[in-house]
Protein backbone atom coordinates (compact mmCIF):
# COMPACT_ATOMS: atom_id res chain seq x y z
CA UNK A 1 0.00 0.00 0.00
CA UNK A 2 2.83 2.32 0.76
CA UNK A 3 4.38 1.81 -2.63
CA UNK A 4 1.08 2.43 -4.43
CA UNK A 5 0.47 5.57 -2.42
CA UNK A 6 3.91 6.88 -3.19
CA UNK A 7 3.41 6.25 -6.90
CA UNK A 8 0.08 8.10 -6.91
CA UNK A 9 1.62 10.96 -5.01
CA UNK A 10 4.52 11.10 -7.44
CA UNK A 11 2.18 11.14 -10.44
CA UNK A 12 0.01 13.91 -9.11
CA UNK A 13 2.67 16.04 -7.35
CA UNK A 14 6.04 15.87 -9.05
CA UNK A 15 9.06 16.15 -6.83
CA UNK A 16 11.06 19.38 -6.72
CA UNK A 17 13.92 20.01 -9.14
CA UNK A 18 16.62 19.43 -6.58
CA UNK A 19 15.82 15.73 -6.42
CA UNK A 20 16.27 15.25 -10.18
CA UNK A 21 19.59 14.22 -11.65
CA UNK A 22 22.01 16.86 -12.95
CA UNK A 23 21.41 16.06 -16.60
CA UNK A 24 17.66 16.47 -16.25
CA UNK A 25 18.04 19.81 -14.42
CA UNK A 26 20.42 21.33 -16.99
CA UNK A 27 18.60 20.11 -20.08
CA UNK A 28 17.24 22.96 -22.29
CA UNK A 29 13.51 23.46 -22.49
CA UNK A 30 11.77 22.22 -25.61
CA UNK A 31 11.23 24.94 -28.24
CA UNK A 32 7.68 26.19 -28.58
CA UNK A 33 6.17 27.26 -31.88
CA UNK A 34 6.11 31.10 -32.38
CA UNK A 35 2.84 32.77 -31.52
CA UNK A 36 1.04 34.69 -34.27
CA UNK A 37 1.58 38.50 -34.35
CA UNK A 38 -1.21 40.44 -32.63
CA UNK A 39 -3.46 42.53 -34.82
CA UNK A 40 -3.05 46.29 -34.26
CA UNK A 41 -5.94 47.75 -32.31
CA UNK A 42 -7.07 51.36 -32.20
CA UNK A 43 -7.27 51.48 -28.42
CA UNK A 44 -4.00 52.51 -26.71
CA UNK A 45 -2.40 50.06 -24.33
CA UNK A 46 -3.66 50.33 -20.80
CA UNK A 47 -0.97 51.35 -18.36
CA UNK A 48 -0.77 49.73 -14.96
CA UNK A 49 -0.06 53.06 -13.23
CA UNK A 50 -2.97 55.39 -12.44
CA UNK A 51 -3.54 58.34 -14.73
CA UNK A 52 -2.85 60.96 -12.06
CA UNK A 53 0.56 59.39 -11.39
CA UNK A 54 1.76 59.12 -14.96
CA UNK A 55 4.46 61.52 -16.09
CA UNK A 56 3.52 63.75 -19.01
CA UNK A 57 5.25 63.01 -22.25
CA UNK A 58 8.06 65.36 -23.13
CA UNK A 59 7.25 67.71 -25.94
CA UNK A 60 9.55 68.23 -28.88
CA UNK A 61 9.91 71.95 -28.10
CA UNK A 62 13.39 73.14 -27.07
CA UNK A 63 14.28 73.28 -23.42
CA UNK A 64 13.10 76.41 -21.64
CA UNK A 65 16.31 76.57 -19.68
CA UNK A 66 18.40 77.52 -22.67
CA UNK A 67 21.22 80.00 -22.42
CA UNK A 68 19.28 82.80 -24.14
CA UNK A 69 16.27 82.45 -21.85
CA UNK A 70 18.43 82.36 -18.76
CA UNK A 71 20.27 85.45 -19.87
CA UNK A 72 17.02 87.28 -20.60
CA UNK A 73 15.67 86.40 -17.16
CA UNK A 74 18.86 87.63 -15.55
CA UNK A 75 18.57 90.92 -17.40
CA UNK A 76 14.99 91.34 -16.23
CA UNK A 77 15.92 90.50 -12.66
CA UNK A 78 18.76 93.02 -12.57
CA UNK A 79 16.58 95.75 -14.01
CA UNK A 80 18.54 96.45 -17.18
CA UNK A 81 15.50 95.59 -19.25
CA UNK A 82 11.93 96.45 -18.23
CA UNK A 83 9.86 93.54 -17.07
CA UNK A 84 6.60 95.12 -18.23
CA UNK A 85 7.07 97.26 -21.30
CA UNK A 86 4.40 99.95 -21.53
CA UNK A 87 4.94 100.26 -25.28
CA UNK A 88 3.08 97.00 -25.74
CA UNK A 89 -0.15 98.05 -24.04
CA UNK A 90 -0.09 101.81 -23.79
CA UNK A 91 -2.45 103.78 -25.95
CA UNK A 92 -0.19 106.78 -26.34
CA UNK A 93 3.19 105.05 -26.79
CA UNK A 94 4.97 106.35 -23.72
CA UNK A 95 8.75 106.36 -24.11
CA UNK A 96 10.53 104.25 -21.55
CA UNK A 97 13.86 105.56 -20.33
CA UNK A 98 15.74 106.16 -17.11
CA UNK A 99 13.97 109.46 -16.49
CA UNK A 100 10.65 107.69 -16.15
CA UNK A 101 11.08 107.19 -12.43
CA UNK A 102 7.63 108.12 -11.18
CA UNK A 103 5.91 105.48 -13.24
CA UNK A 104 3.82 102.91 -11.45
CA UNK A 105 6.26 100.19 -12.42
CA UNK A 106 4.66 96.80 -12.80
CA UNK A 107 0.99 96.80 -13.66
CA UNK A 108 -1.54 95.47 -11.20
CA UNK A 109 0.61 95.15 -8.11
CA UNK A 110 0.11 96.36 -4.59
CA UNK A 111 3.72 96.03 -3.51
CA UNK A 112 4.82 98.87 -1.29
CA UNK A 113 8.18 100.33 -2.18
CA UNK A 114 9.71 103.76 -2.07
CA UNK A 115 9.20 106.46 -4.65
CA UNK A 116 11.92 107.57 -7.04
CA UNK A 117 13.95 104.42 -6.78
CA UNK A 118 17.12 104.20 -8.89
CA UNK A 119 16.66 103.25 -12.48
CA UNK A 120 18.50 99.95 -12.04
CA UNK A 121 15.82 98.66 -9.67
CA UNK A 122 12.96 100.71 -11.05
CA UNK A 123 11.48 98.13 -13.37
CA UNK A 124 11.77 95.27 -10.92
CA UNK A 125 9.69 96.82 -8.15
CA UNK A 126 6.46 98.80 -8.45
CA UNK A 127 6.17 102.01 -6.57
CA UNK A 128 4.03 102.88 -3.60
CA UNK A 129 1.94 105.31 -5.63
CA UNK A 130 0.77 103.03 -8.40
CA UNK A 131 -2.15 104.64 -10.20
CA UNK A 132 -2.90 102.05 -12.83
CA UNK A 133 -0.05 102.68 -15.25
CA UNK A 134 -0.27 101.46 -18.83
CA UNK A 135 -4.01 101.14 -19.13
CA UNK A 136 -4.60 98.91 -16.16
CA UNK A 137 -7.91 97.33 -15.31
CA UNK A 138 -10.63 99.47 -13.74
CA UNK A 139 -9.44 99.94 -10.21
CA UNK A 140 -5.83 99.15 -10.94
CA UNK A 141 -3.68 99.33 -7.83
CA UNK A 142 -5.58 102.25 -6.32
CA UNK A 143 -9.39 102.28 -6.09
CA UNK A 144 -10.97 104.80 -8.39
CA UNK A 145 -8.41 104.70 -11.18
CA UNK A 146 -9.99 104.55 -14.58
CA UNK A 147 -8.87 102.46 -17.52
CA UNK A 148 -7.78 105.59 -19.37
CA UNK A 149 -4.88 106.24 -17.02
CA UNK A 150 -1.84 105.44 -19.12
CA UNK A 151 1.00 106.08 -16.74
CA UNK A 152 1.67 109.79 -16.31
CA UNK A 153 2.05 109.55 -12.55
CA UNK A 154 3.15 112.84 -11.07
CA UNK A 155 2.72 114.77 -14.29
CA UNK A 156 5.99 113.45 -15.70
CA UNK A 157 4.45 112.10 -18.87
CA UNK A 158 1.39 113.19 -20.77
CA UNK A 159 -1.80 111.19 -20.74
CA UNK A 160 -3.44 110.61 -17.39
CA UNK A 161 -4.07 114.17 -16.30
CA UNK A 162 -5.69 114.93 -19.62
CA UNK A 163 -8.24 112.19 -19.16
CA UNK A 164 -8.94 111.56 -15.50
CA UNK A 165 -9.75 115.24 -14.73
CA UNK A 166 -8.53 115.02 -11.20
CA UNK A 167 -10.31 111.80 -10.30
CA UNK A 168 -7.03 110.08 -9.53
CA UNK A 169 -6.21 110.82 -5.88
CA UNK A 170 -2.74 111.91 -5.00
CA UNK A 171 -1.32 112.62 -8.43
CA UNK A 172 1.18 115.38 -7.90
CA UNK A 173 1.42 118.54 -9.92
CA UNK A 174 4.48 119.24 -12.04
CA UNK A 175 4.66 122.72 -10.53
CA UNK A 176 4.21 122.16 -6.82
CA UNK A 177 5.19 118.44 -7.07
CA UNK A 178 2.25 117.40 -4.93
CA UNK A 179 3.36 119.47 -1.97
CA UNK A 180 0.01 121.18 -1.78
CA UNK A 181 -2.22 119.11 0.45
CA UNK A 182 -5.70 118.45 -0.78
CA UNK A 183 -5.16 119.73 -4.31
CA UNK A 184 -6.45 117.31 -6.94
CA UNK A 185 -4.83 116.80 -10.31
CA UNK A 186 -6.16 118.76 -13.24
CA UNK A 187 -6.09 118.52 -17.00
CA UNK A 188 -3.64 121.34 -17.77
CA UNK A 189 -0.81 119.10 -18.90
CA UNK A 190 0.11 117.81 -15.48
CA UNK A 191 -0.76 120.95 -13.54
CA UNK A 192 -3.19 120.80 -10.66
CA UNK A 193 -6.34 122.84 -10.85
CA UNK A 194 -5.24 125.53 -8.46
CA UNK A 195 -1.88 125.93 -10.13
CA UNK A 196 -3.45 126.16 -13.55
CA UNK A 197 -6.25 128.51 -12.64
CA UNK A 198 -6.00 130.16 -9.23
CA UNK A 199 -8.73 132.33 -7.88
CA UNK A 200 -8.76 135.83 -9.33
CA UNK A 201 -5.98 135.27 -11.88
CA UNK A 202 -6.36 134.66 -15.58
CA UNK A 203 -3.64 132.63 -17.18
CA UNK A 204 -2.85 131.81 -20.74
CA UNK A 205 -3.10 128.27 -21.95
CA UNK A 206 -0.63 125.90 -20.29
CA UNK A 207 0.77 128.74 -18.21
CA UNK A 208 1.51 128.08 -14.60
CA UNK A 209 1.03 130.45 -11.76
CA UNK A 210 4.59 129.90 -10.59
CA UNK A 211 5.92 131.78 -13.60
CA UNK A 212 4.82 135.13 -12.18
CA UNK A 213 3.89 136.37 -8.71
CA UNK A 214 0.26 136.93 -7.91
CA UNK A 215 0.83 139.94 -5.70
CA UNK A 216 3.52 142.59 -5.48
CA UNK A 217 6.25 141.72 -2.97
CA UNK A 218 6.25 142.98 0.60
CA UNK A 219 2.55 143.56 0.72
CA UNK A 220 0.31 142.27 3.50
CA UNK A 221 -1.51 139.04 3.03
CA UNK A 222 -0.47 136.08 0.95
CA UNK A 223 1.89 138.24 -1.10
CA UNK A 224 4.82 137.55 1.22
CA UNK A 225 5.59 134.41 -0.74
CA UNK A 226 8.73 134.69 -2.81
CA UNK A 227 8.29 134.91 -6.59
CA UNK A 228 8.71 131.61 -8.35
CA UNK A 229 6.94 129.60 -5.68
CA UNK A 230 3.72 127.79 -6.30
CA UNK A 231 0.87 130.10 -5.33
CA UNK A 232 -1.84 127.52 -5.75
CA UNK A 233 -2.07 126.93 -2.03
CA UNK A 234 -2.80 130.57 -1.19
CA UNK A 235 -6.42 131.35 -2.00
CA UNK A 236 -7.53 134.95 -1.76
CA UNK A 237 -9.83 135.11 1.18
CA UNK A 238 -10.93 138.08 3.30
CA UNK A 239 -10.22 136.07 6.43
CA UNK A 240 -6.48 136.15 5.78
CA UNK A 241 -4.57 138.47 8.06
CA UNK A 242 -1.08 139.89 7.71
CA UNK A 243 1.69 138.19 9.66
CA UNK A 244 1.99 139.04 13.32
CA UNK A 245 -1.63 139.91 14.04
CA UNK A 246 -3.34 136.59 14.60
CA UNK A 247 -2.68 133.03 13.63
CA UNK A 248 -6.32 132.21 13.06
CA UNK A 249 -9.23 134.25 11.77
CA UNK A 250 -12.02 135.32 14.02
CA UNK A 251 -15.07 133.20 14.64
CA UNK A 252 -13.31 129.85 14.30
CA UNK A 253 -13.12 127.51 17.25
CA UNK A 254 -10.88 124.54 17.72
CA UNK A 255 -13.63 122.03 16.99
CA UNK A 256 -14.40 123.62 13.64
CA UNK A 257 -10.87 123.71 12.25
CA UNK A 258 -8.48 121.25 10.75
CA UNK A 259 -5.09 122.85 10.42
CA UNK A 260 -2.47 121.48 8.07
CA UNK A 261 0.69 122.95 6.60
CA UNK A 262 2.23 122.85 3.16
CA UNK A 263 5.95 122.65 2.36
CA UNK A 264 5.28 124.85 -0.63
CA UNK A 265 4.44 127.69 1.76
CA UNK A 266 5.71 126.78 5.22
CA UNK A 267 4.48 129.96 6.86
CA UNK A 268 0.90 129.50 5.65
CA UNK A 269 -1.54 127.33 7.53
CA UNK A 270 -4.66 125.94 5.93
CA UNK A 271 -7.87 125.78 7.89
CA UNK A 272 -10.86 123.80 6.76
CA UNK A 273 -13.80 125.84 7.86
CA UNK A 274 -17.06 123.97 8.07
CA UNK A 275 -20.18 125.97 7.62
CA UNK A 276 -23.69 124.59 7.88
CA UNK A 277 -25.17 122.60 6.37
CA UNK A 278 -22.44 120.93 4.31
CA UNK A 279 -20.11 123.60 3.01
CA UNK A 280 -16.37 123.53 3.54
CA UNK A 281 -14.21 126.58 3.01
CA UNK A 282 -10.43 126.44 2.76
CA UNK A 283 -8.85 129.42 4.45
CA UNK A 284 -5.15 130.25 4.26
CA UNK A 285 -3.81 132.00 7.32
CA UNK A 286 -0.30 133.13 8.07
CA UNK A 287 1.35 131.61 11.09
CA UNK A 288 4.23 132.83 13.17
CA UNK A 289 6.06 129.55 12.90
CA UNK A 290 7.92 129.11 9.64
CA UNK A 291 8.93 125.52 10.35
CA UNK A 292 7.38 122.88 8.15
CA UNK A 293 5.00 120.51 9.88
CA UNK A 294 4.47 117.19 8.13
CA UNK A 295 0.89 116.03 7.58
CA UNK A 296 1.23 113.41 10.31
CA UNK A 297 1.58 116.14 12.90
CA UNK A 298 -1.07 118.50 11.61
CA UNK A 299 -2.92 118.90 14.87
CA UNK A 300 -4.33 122.36 15.55
CA UNK A 301 -2.58 124.23 18.33
CA UNK A 302 -4.66 124.98 21.40
CA UNK A 303 -6.47 128.27 21.20
CA UNK A 304 -6.22 130.65 24.12
CA UNK A 305 -9.51 131.65 25.64
CA UNK A 306 -9.93 135.40 26.09
CA UNK A 307 -9.90 136.55 29.71
CA UNK A 308 -13.36 136.97 31.17
CA UNK A 309 -14.47 139.85 33.30
Swiss-Prot record:
Residues 58-67 have a biased composition (Basic and acidic residues). Residues 30-43, 297-309 have a biased composition (Pro residues). Residues 1-94, 286-309 are annotated as: Disordered. This is Uncharacterized protein J1L.
Amino acid sequence: IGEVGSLVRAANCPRPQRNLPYAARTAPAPAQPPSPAPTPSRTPPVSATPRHRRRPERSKTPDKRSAETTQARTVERTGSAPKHRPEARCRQQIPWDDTHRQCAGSVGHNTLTALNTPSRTHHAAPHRRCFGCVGARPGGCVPGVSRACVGCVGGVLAGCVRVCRGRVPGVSCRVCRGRVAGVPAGCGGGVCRRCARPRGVRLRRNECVASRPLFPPRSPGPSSLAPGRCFSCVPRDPCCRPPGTSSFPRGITQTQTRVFFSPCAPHVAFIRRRRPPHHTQLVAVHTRNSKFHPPAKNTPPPLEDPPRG
